[in-house]
Amino acid sequence: MRGGPQSALDPGADHAAAVYDLTLLLFIGGGAIFAAVMALSLYAVLARPERFPGARAWVFGGGILFPVVVLTALQVYEFGIARRLTAPTGQDTLRVAVVGYMWWWEVRYPDGVATANEIVIPAGRPVEFTVTTADVIHSFWIPSLAGKIDMIPGHVNRLTLTAHKPGIYRGQCAEYCGAQHTRMAFDVTVLPPDRFADWLAGQERPAAEPADPVLAAGRDAFLKAGCGECHTVRGTPAAGKRGPDLTHVGSRPTLAAGTFPNGVGSLAGWIAGAQHLKPENRMPSFGTLDGETLRAMAAWLESLK
C-alpha cells in the first residue's frame, strides 16, 4: 500500500479518490498561477522599459484575468465534487453511527450491534457514517478512505463513502482533544460482502458461555470487580454504558483505541494499569487484583471472539 495504511496518497474509496484528484488539480492550478506571476515579475524586473509595451494590458491579463479564470474553474470543479460527495444515499446504504469519547470510539451498527475502536465495512457498498461526540470536539478521519469531518457536541455530521479495496485502513482523531489525543486511533477493515455478512452475524450473537473453569472464573471476577457497571457484555449481567461494549472484544486487533495489540498480556496489563498506560482516561486501574484473578479475567475477555 503506497504510503502505508494511513496515507491520503493511496485512496481506497471514492471519497478519498475525489479528495486526491482535487488536491492534484489545485496543486497544478496553483502552480500554474505561481509560475505565470513569477515569470511576469522576472520579466518586469529584467526587461528594459522600452521592451515592455502595453504595461496595463500585461498587468490586467497576467495579474488579474489569468488568476481569476484559473481559480474560478478550480472553484466550479470543487463545488461539483462537494455536491457529489454529499448527494443523498440509497436504500442499500449501510449506516454506521460513531460517537467520539475522550479517548476512544463507540461504533454502532443496525440491529443493536456495537463495537469500539474498530469499524468493519463491506467493499463496494455505500456506507454512511453519522458522527457526533459525547464530550469535546473530535475529528473523524480515515485518510485512505475519506476526508476528515468534525464531531461536534449536540450536532450530527454525515460522511458517505464506498470502499473499493479490501484491506485494513487506519483512522485517527484529527482535532486536538486532550492529553491522549495522539492515542485515539481506530482500524477500518474493508471486507468482501460475503465475509462482512458473516462478521456482522457473529457480532449479533451474545457472548458464549465459558466451558473452561478458568474462563468461567475470569467472567465471575469481571462481574465481581464491578466492571459491568461501565461495560456491556451481552449474554451476561454486565450492561454498563460508560465504556466500550466488550461482547466480542477478543476479536478486535487492538486495545485502548489503537494503543496496544490485543492479547491476554495486553488485556491484563490494561486492567491492572490503565491509568499508567494511558493517563487521564476514564478507566481506573485495578492494581489490587492478584495475578491469578487478573490472568483469568484477561483470558476470558480474550476468548470473547
Language-model regions: role of each:
Residues 112-117, 194-223:
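Electrostatic cytochrome c docking/interface patches
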Residues 201-213, 237-305:
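Extracytoplasmic electron-transfer domains, predominantly the class I c-type cytochrome c fold
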Residues 179, 236-237:
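Short, non-ligating residues that shape and space the ligands of small metal-coordination modules
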Residues 173, 218, 224-234, 267, ...:
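The canonical Cys-X-X-Cys-His
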Residues 99, 174, 189, 247-250, ...:
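Residue-level detector of conserved, well-ordered beta-strand and adjacent loop positions
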